[in-house]
Amino acid sequence: MTERVQVGGIQIAKNLYDFVNNEAIPGTGIEADKFWAEFDKIVNELAPRNRELLLKRDEIQEKMDTWNREHKGQKLDMAEYKAFLKDIGYLVDEPADFKISTSNVDPEIATMAGPQLVVPVMNARFALNAANARWGSLYDALYGTDAISEENGAEKGRGYNPVRGAKVIEWARNLLDGSAPLASGSHKDAAKYYIDGGKLAVKLQNGDVTGLKDESGFVGYTGAADAPTGVLLVKNGMHFEIQIDASHPIGKDDGAHVKDVLMESALTTIMDCEDSVAAVDADDKVVAYKNWLGLMKGDLEESFEKGGQMMTRRMNGDRTYTGADGSELTLKGRSLLFVRNVGHLMTNPAILLKDGSEIPEGLMDGLVTSLIAIHDLKGDGKFQNSTKGSVYIVKPKQHGPEEVAFTNEFFGRVEDALGLPRFTLKVGIMDEERRTTVNLKACIHAAKERTVFINTGFLDRTGDEIHTSMELGPFIRKGPMKQAAWINAYEQWNVDIGLEAGLSGVAQIGKGMWAMPDLMAGMLEAKIGHPKAGANTAWVPSPTAATLHATHYHQVNVFDVQKELANRQRASLDDILTVPVMEDPSSLSAEDIQQELDNNAQGILGYVVRWIDQGVGCSKVPDINDVGLMEDRATLRISSQLLTNWLYHGICSEEQIMETMKRMAAVVDKQNAGDAAYRNMAPNFDDSIAFQAAVDLVLKGREQPAGYTEPLLHAYRQKAKAKYGQ
């Protein structure tokens, strides 16, 4: 039984109450009694409004279901469909043209373009790795991944392979030639780098001395001018440092004693309290909030054993250089941090309201994470996150402008409660629900003084696409879905609306995750498409991926791209509204159907078993072909909703689903054989809470609000914690 403290009209789990009073509040200048009194007032006043917004979702969905049932199997008459959507309040009138007026935005968001990490804030080690991923070794990123082929003797092996090393160095020199070309010759022929009269001089192997073709690309250096240990360059706002050390194992054999190229990598990181964590009660929420506090104060540490030695990870300090003009230059050593709160749907037993109901978790997140961020705003921590006095909060899974307006109002209430200037709290709007996509301009307008990013998310957005139009017919397979007309239009529309609303130079226009952390060669080839599409940030699955993706922003000046795109015709709303149902379900072979069932069932089970049994909300889960995929609740939503849809429309039977689930459970068990903490699902399926959760996500998928997986996951995780004593 949870021990609780009664404060006014709320009952707070004692461990959360103690954490806030004894750890979060000291140093903020806020009085604990006043904080809880304001907290009580805000949540008890706004919780009913929160519930009303959720009821409106249900009412709209019921009307959609009825209309879709009546039009099943018919070709959509787009004029009729849009009139219906307007009639039920799904599609609202677009506001007149406007530009966002967000102020005090850090340059990493407003005027720079580069990779973004998303990490579970409950994992301190991951959080620290991400915070420190502002800078990364290009040599390590290339050597340790498939970005460099293992062909022709370039295998990774156990020790250092000089053949592979040579390929890494060649790749890096090519990057230097592209990002910092010399007036004559190539970086491959460099014999010495030095500073002469505030400019970079490069002595070549043939004795010639040259410099940069564009001298403004030289920013600063470390060490002595005539023998620098580091040369700092910049391309399209992204810094990179040629590191020189003749005594280093790599540097000693290099023509110019270059040991590495250090890349400015993850400009921003989202510390996630949402889709990548499993936080179902006060114990879990305290872990999340405590790590966020450590990040805001700069004192988060994590000790762990590696190779038989204890190591302690901490946040990196800033980087200091001598500038080209001789003055001291300091660059941030850490990624700029956002925090992602949960959306409007879930409640949490950590706090009970005056009517005994659980608190809307998003209200709790907003109040507590903002309180904690005061440590950064006051500048009394070890490091500064925002140099502009802002707090960056990502708000996911909002449906339409009314819900964004509610967030905007709530943030204002939080600012007043904490004594913060208006619009200190900035908002990142995830464009991952269909009603937000089609009303994106109105959504941005509802928070036009706070918006610092919009971001597309293919997986959640597809999950909502399926659930919204569940009754219309069976949906196409997950693979072809990525090429469907609506997705391309959705991705373009997000950029078009963002540019119309004046986000360029003020806020981020973001793109989604590369979900295959082991396939970096593929990422290097494909993900340049994101900056080319006008996105000034895009999600990557690891610090290594951030370093490699950073090279794309050297090749593409995103702000130039945005200027060009600002004049193109906006993407078609009709395309976005085109529902990707199958034209001819009978064309699917039995083999096609089973393959899709196997693939989705395996992904569902592989993710759910770790979520339920171990409380792991984000992990690299091997797919059916043993390719490691980064999975979070978004991937689970699309997989479960697709199977729900196929079952509902008779593409497959419940018996088929169960047979597939049981067979795939054995596959997942085998894939996890090396994990000592793992609990097998097969063959005692009735005893496996995780297996039951996975099955329910499919069999009860139509009943889940918007196809979200959280209600079932939370319920089953709480069961597992009770059963296993976690």
UniProtKB/Swiss-Prot annotation:
One cellular component term from this protein's GO annotations in UniProt:
cytosol
Q: Which cofactor does it need?
A: Mg(2+)
> Signal sequence: where?
none
Q: Name one Pfam family in it.
A: MSG_insertion
The alphabetized UniProt keywords are: Cytoplasm, Glyoxylate bypass, Magnesium, Metal-binding, Oxidation, Transferase, Tricarboxylic acid cycle
**Active-site residues (renumbered):** 340, 632
- List localization entries: Cytoplasm
Superkingdom, natural source: Bacteria
Q: Identify which top EC class this enzyme belongs to.
A: transferase
Q: Which residues bind Mg(2+)?
A: 432, 460
- MF annotations from Gene Ontology: magnesium ion binding; malate synthase activity
InterPro entries named in the record: Malate_synth_C_sf, Malate_synth_sf, Malate_synthase_TIM, Malate_synthG, MS_C, MS_N, MS_N_TIM-barrel_dom, MSG_insertion
Q: Where does glyoxylate bind?
A: 340, 432, 457-460
The record lists the catalysed reaction(s) as:
glyoxylate + acetyl-CoA + H2O = (S)-malate + CoA + H(+)
EC assignment: the record states 2.3.3.9
Can you tell me which residues bind acetyl-CoA?
A: 118, 125-126, 276, 313, 541
Question: Sorted alphabetically, which CDD domains does this protein's record hold?
Answer: malate_synt_G
From its record, what is one biological process in GO terms? Answer: glyoxylate catabolic process
Listed SUPFAM superfamilies = Malate synthase G
Q: In which pathway does it act?
A: Carbohydrate metabolism; glyoxylate cycle; (S)-malate from isocitrate: step 2/2
Where Cysteine sulfenic acid (-SOH) occurs, residue numbers?
618
Q: Which family does it belong to?
A: Belongs to the malate synthase family. GlcB subfamily.
How the protein assembles, per its UniProt entry? Monomer.
What HAMAP family does the annotation carry? Malate_synth_G (MF_00641)
**According to its UniProt entry, what is the function of this protein?**
Involved in the glycolate utilization. Catalyzes the condensation and subsequent hydrolysis of acetyl-coenzyme A (acetyl-CoA) and glyoxylate to form malate and CoA.
What this protein is called in its record is Malate synthase G
Query: Which species does the entry assign this protein to?
Result: Marinobacter nauticus (strain ATCC 700491 / DSM 11845 / VT8)
What's the gene?
glcB
